[in-house]
Amino acid sequence: MSSSSRRPARRAALTARSSYDESLVDAELESYLGNARSRRISRLRRLSADERQRETETEALIALSLGFPIDELLPAERPLLPAPVAAAPNDYIVVRNHILASWRADPRVPLPRSRVQETVAASYDNLVAVAHGFLAREGHINFGVSAAFPASPPPDAPQRLAASVLVVGAGLAGLAAARQLLRFGLRVLVLEGRARPGGRVYTTHLGGDQAAVELGGSVITGIHTNPLGVLARQLGIPLHKVRDSCPLYHHDGRTVDMKLDRSMDLVFNTLLEHATRLREYLKKAAEGISLGEGIERLRRFYKVAKSVEEREVLDWHLANLEFSNAGCLSELSLAHWDQDDQYEMGGDHCFLAGGNARLVHALCDGVPVLYEKTVKRIEHGEDGVSITVEGGQVFKADMALCTAPLGVLKSRSIIFEPELPERKLEAIQRLGFGLLNKVAMVFPHVFWDEEIDTFGCLNKERSKRGEFFLFYSYHTVSGGAVLIALVAGEAALEFEKVDPAVALHRVLGILKGIYGPKGVTVPDPIQSCCTRWGSDPLCSGSYSHIRVGSSGTDYDILAESVNDRLFFAGEATNRAYPATMHGALLSGLREASKILHASESRLNSDYKKYALQKSIRLINNVLDDLFMEPDLECGRFSFVFSYITPEEEQAPGLARITLEKPLLLPSKKRKVKGNQKDQDPVAEKIDQEVFYLYATVSQEQATELLECDNDKSRIAVLCKDLGVKLMGYDSTYDVCSHLISSISRAQKARKRLQGPKSLKTGL
């Protein structure tokens, strides 16, 4: 997803947000967020009027950077407040902003309402209760992945009837939603088409598994108030600021003259400012013009970038703009391409040490996920939802959350029954879904400048301006000499047709052209990998943008639920933060709140629940998958364990006992006359069905059971000698959901350890 250390300056669009100037408030936010303890103590001191005003203003800036209006209520807040407070909400807004700032000051532990009440006057307790409840429910506070935020309800949470939710996709949006829903007390299962979590956030390991390489979303863009920064802080993962220096090189290896570079940078940003004025002048007519066409008209009108070298440098900046938007400038809407700039998060752009997969796996912890379950059909109606995956397996639940990428929705590879509303289909069609590809390389050593994180290369041909135009160095965070070449714009589309060996040869030619004249030998990489995101049927592209004819409203339409049964999340449903990793995560938190509200509303209306344990059971499918390849079998007993190596004798596991269940007792058999058998043929058929009982056992206990002579003895030893309680489907899921997830992860880990798999080039 989109990121760049040399992101195009787009300040012309920030006039509506003049009260927030990133360059002026970054230091203040850093000071506030970086010293939680001293700030809390200061709240308890007697502050002067000026000090309190200063603190209130800083907290308002934090709220603003989180997407809250600085002096207004969110639409969802107004109905929660008494009419007099809603009419004059200043006190509530100050309290709300204080809660947001307090949470962000130290997000490693939950922020209970009682702690907030200790820092404000008692007369505001009611406002604290409303604001704290709203912010926690909406996922603005008290979310995360540390031990303090497990994927289960808090011990003091109220008991509620648990609705069931199927989540399509284990990317950042799906995992964030699933984790939040589990904390709300709902029943959740995630269906993921890949054999791994993360979706378009994909950290692989090259060079003998030593170096972490980002093939998908890579940079945390704007660390201030970024929820990904919250997760990193909770996990204690260090962040590396992407340094600003980004030298440019000609295609023959010469360094671009600094004066020329600065001149064209100014020209580029001036063209963008004039493009903003052009659309204001054209008004409605701008809706049908592309950003590329507008910039080219302006370039010719002002007669800038006329020489070959000037044009090549300007093209580099245009390629960088195409990278930021994952789309060709000829497709981007002049009228709306930068509609999200006013929400852009402040602060440095950062790399995460060890790769973004660390965040993904932390989000996965405790969340039940079934992998290699490609969704083909989603049926939704008054009775609930039914999802069919490739191979015909069916899952049913009360509600479903679809986090499929926009590219998948565009491809119509998922059938919706009934069809999605026409306005949603039209929004899917209008929005753009572009492409960014990469060539990732691990070298024996770092031969480039270790004091920079990025450098760029110009191209002669305009159609190829995005081919290997920017290089990212990950040697500071990856554990190896990792260099990644980016391919954007038209070049990204053509790149999908290029043989990986040819692509690697071109990249090495560029690097040798840059460093050879400096006397530096460019070694062959130890290992390399080329992405093919456009050819990947599980995403069909990289991230969204606003195409000609579209607008930010289409993001909102894509986020709309269907009859409170079918919900949608993902970066392409987040109008404020599209095309970003944090936008995906925030959309998942948003939908978790909507699903909880829909669930509670349905219960309050005396709705007949369509629970997980009814009909085709969700948990039945989960357990069937676990026992497809049992670790041990004997008679009617099967065993699966959470160990990774067989030496872990105390590793917990599950035993499954297969039994026959006559559903019609002999005393209830239907008496018939004549020569017919005294047996109901339907009952005879049902009598042949089986059911399962489950028990938690260790590997050591399972070995003891296997030594018994028969199944009857095993049951006696299990229940009497070992004192183990047998459970049905529902109890097993309620009691053992975390163990089920652990066994599933262990099974996948053991498969990986059975032998190294060949690394395929591409995705």
Swiss-Prot record:
Q: Domain of life of the organism in this record? A: Eukaryota
Name what cofactor the protein needs.
Answer: FAD
Binding positions for FAD per the UniProt entry: E192, R194, R200, E571
User: Locate the SWIRM domain: which residues?
Assistant: 53-152
What GO biological process terms are annotated to this protein in UniProt? chromatin organization; spermine catabolic process; thermospermine catabolic process
Its family remark reads: Belongs to the flavin monoamine oxidase family.
Role summary: Probable histone demethylase.
Q: What is this protein called?
A: Lysine-specific histone demethylase 1 homolog 2
Which organism does this record belong to? Oryza sativa subsp. japonica (Rice)
